[in-house]
């Protein structure tokens, strides 16, 4: 009878997969502890292997991302150099080394709608241009580059140097103070001031994130900051386009101008207060709800007295204003490193 019971127990353990311990009526505690320790070590080894595999995959993805980013930048550089060569072939009237008097000025479009001084082409010889390139610590001749392409590259570098000087001047002196009180009377002037301030702030935000090392972006917080910046930049570009096209009414534009002015003066409490008045207005419902009952109320008409009330109903404007709020948050967080604008 005992033999039959032991055989049944052994078969049951085989079916359950728990036949590590011998089928006995009794066993020592030390054997049980050894078996438990063995299972624990096996599970720990499996978890370590999974962790190492996950870490290896993340490292491979990061390397692929960096390689892709480097490849895209190289392709962009090649494309820009190819465009410059094509532009040189179409705009250069003759293969002369000296620039002709008819083309003494290089047409430079406004960069980011800021005033950029024109770059004049002096009658420099190729030897003088090579000397200038050496002073700028740039290669005097690229592979397969013609003399005309060298001259064009020099003036392109000169243009970028001028833009860099303007950027440095903006970083040290700051942009013009926004005259938000006359936003309705002198709207074109104030629009230019607001656009210049927003673009300058976006550049500072971008430089702040670019100055961080690659290792710092491994944390979830840094990745979230980068994601917020990309989305905010995209929506702020839409807001800038709305301002340039004068697609905003005077009340909304004046409120945005005042928000930017308060950021210039580092008055972030007033800037946030103005943001709340712009987004919510006189309405007590921040999500656009204006009716909570079936009966019309006298106070409901007063809720719509301010044209900016319930502005969050418009999805496009809501995203723009959300990006503006994130812009205010960044300015407030980095206010110690940003210059205060003076009249």
UniProtKB/Swiss-Prot annotation:
Q: Does the record bear Metal-binding in its keywords? A: no
Q: Show the segment(s) annotated as Disordered.
A: 80-105
Report the subcellular localization.
Nucleus
Single GO BP term: mRNA cis splicing, via spliceosome
Q: Which InterPro entries match?
A: Prp18, PRP4-like, PRP4-like_sf, PRPF18
Listed A to Z, the keywords are:
mRNA processing, mRNA splicing, Nucleus, Spliceosome
According to the UniProt record, one GO cellular component term is: nucleus
Q: Does the keyword Nucleotide-binding apply?
A: no
| Role according to the record | Participates in the second step of pre-mRNA splicing.
Family (UniProt):
Belongs to the PRP18 family.
The protein here is known as: Pre-mRNA-splicing factor 18
Which organism is the protein's source? Schizosaccharomyces pombe (strain 972 / ATCC 24843) (Fission yeast)
- Upper taxonomic classification of the species? Eukaryota, Fungi, Dikarya, Ascomycota, Taphrinomycotina
The gene for this chain is: prp18
């Amino acid at each position: 009878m005992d033999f039959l019971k032991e055989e049944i127990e052994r078969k049951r353990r085989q079916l359950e997969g728990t036949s590590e311990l011998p089928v006995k009526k009794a066993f020592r505690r030390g054997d049980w502890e050894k078996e438990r320790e063995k299972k624990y070590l096996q599970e720990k080894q499996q978890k370590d292997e999974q962790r190492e595999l996950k870490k290896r995959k993340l490292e491979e993805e990061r390397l692929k991302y960096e390689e892709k980013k480097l490849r895209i930048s190289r392709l962009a550089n090649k494309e820009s150099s190819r465009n410059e060569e094509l532009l040189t072939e179409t705009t250069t009237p003759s293969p002369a080394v000296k620039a002709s008097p008819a083309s003494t000025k290089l047409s430079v479009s406004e960069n980011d709608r800021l005033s950029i001084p024109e770059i004049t082409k002096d009658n420099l010889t190729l030897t003088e241009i090579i000397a200038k390139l050496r002073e700028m610590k740039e290669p005097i001749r690229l592979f397969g580059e013609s003399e005309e392409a060298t001259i064009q590259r020099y003036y392109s570098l000169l243009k970028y140097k001028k833009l860099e000087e303007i950027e440095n001047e903006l970083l040290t002196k700051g942009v013009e103070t926004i005259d938000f009180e006359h936003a309705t009377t002198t709207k074109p002037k104030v629009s230019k001031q607001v656009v210049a301030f927003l673009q300058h702030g976006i550049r500072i935000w971008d430089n702040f994130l670019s100055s961080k090392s690659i290792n710092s972006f491994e944390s979830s917080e840094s990745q979230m900051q980068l994601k917020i910046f990309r989305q905010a930049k995209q929506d702020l570009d839409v807001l800038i386009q709305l301002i340039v096209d004068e697609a905003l009414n005077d009340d909304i534009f004046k409120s945005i101008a005042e928000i930017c002015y308060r950021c210039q003066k580092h008055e972030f409490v007033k800037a946030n207060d103005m943001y709340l008045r712009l987004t919510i207005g006189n309405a007590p419902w921040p999500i656009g709800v204006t009716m909570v009952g079936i009966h019309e109320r006298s106070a409901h008409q007063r809720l719509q007295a301010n044209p900016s009330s319930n502005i969050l109903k418009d999805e496009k404007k809501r995203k723009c204003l959300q990006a503006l709020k994130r812009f205010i948050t960044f300015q407030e967080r980095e206010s110690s490193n940003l210059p205060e604008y003076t009249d």
